Structure formats: structure tokens, C-alpha cells
Amino acid sequence: MDIISFYRVERWLFERLIPVLPKIVQLLIFLIFNSKITADSKIGKGSYCVCKGISTVLIPGTEIGENCVLGLRFSTVRQFPYKEVPCLKNNVWVGPNVIIAGPVVIEDDVVIAGNSFVNRSVPIGAIVAGCPAKIIGWRKNLDYAIETNPKYKDGRMPFLTK
């Protein structure tokens, strides 16, 4: 079982107003995965965490859309003085060690590169990277589909040149 399976159980118990059991499941998530996902966060269908969700931290109220891929050590945090929390729309790919801070909206079909710090909203189809994150490209300009998993190629990569 992965962290999303535990979250789904926690969320189901939370929605049915069962008092103590969601906190017990949240404790299990912390002990097994070293992660924190509260029951009032919303994670859409088809979304998953790589490496079973190790070290994932979602602050209460975080919304994640459908078919999102969340990298290892993905975190969402609040940003003072705002009350709102991050919202990820559908088909967002988040790399490892990404932090999303503040009341930002990550629109559909966005790619966030690893080790990025996102503190501004990201438009549809953007590819962002850096600390703080900046737009480095657009998904529509890619000559391949990032969500597919092509077959492995034979051989080795060529050497670096100047």
C-alpha cells in the first residue's frame, strides 16, 4: 500500500464524521511514510506519489487535482500573511524536493522541475524550474509526451562536448 491508499481511508473516515480513526490513520501515515497528509486535504483520482509518498507534507486544505504525479519529498506550505493554501489543478507533474508556498494556483498540464521553490501561480502548460521558480518553457513546444513512458533504448549516451 502507498500513502494515497492510507489517505483515501483517512478521508473516507473524515467525511463520515468518525471521530478518532482519521487521526490514527494520520499517525500511521507519519510512522510508516514519514509524511503528513491531513484528511481535509483533497487529492483527485489518478494522482499518486512516487516512491510511495516518502516525506510528503501537505498542509491542511491543500487541493490536488486528478492525474497528478507528486515527487519524493514534495511539500506545500503557507506563506504569511495569506490564509489560502496551494491548489494544484489536473495533470500536474511535480519533481522531487519541490516546495509550493502560499496561495498559489498551479494550472493544468504544468511541469515543475525538481528542487524548485514555487511561490507564484503558474499558467496552463508551463514548465517551471528554479528557486524561486521561473518559466523555462511550455509543454506545447515539446516534441514528446511527458506523461508516456517510452521503451528503453539500447546503447549509451554520447560524451559531453564543449
Role assignments for model-derived ranges:
Residues 39, 44-51, 59-60, 65-66, ...:
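Left-handed beta-helix
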Residues 78-80, 99-104, 141-142, 156-161:
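Short C-terminal domain-edge/linker segments immediately following a structured domain
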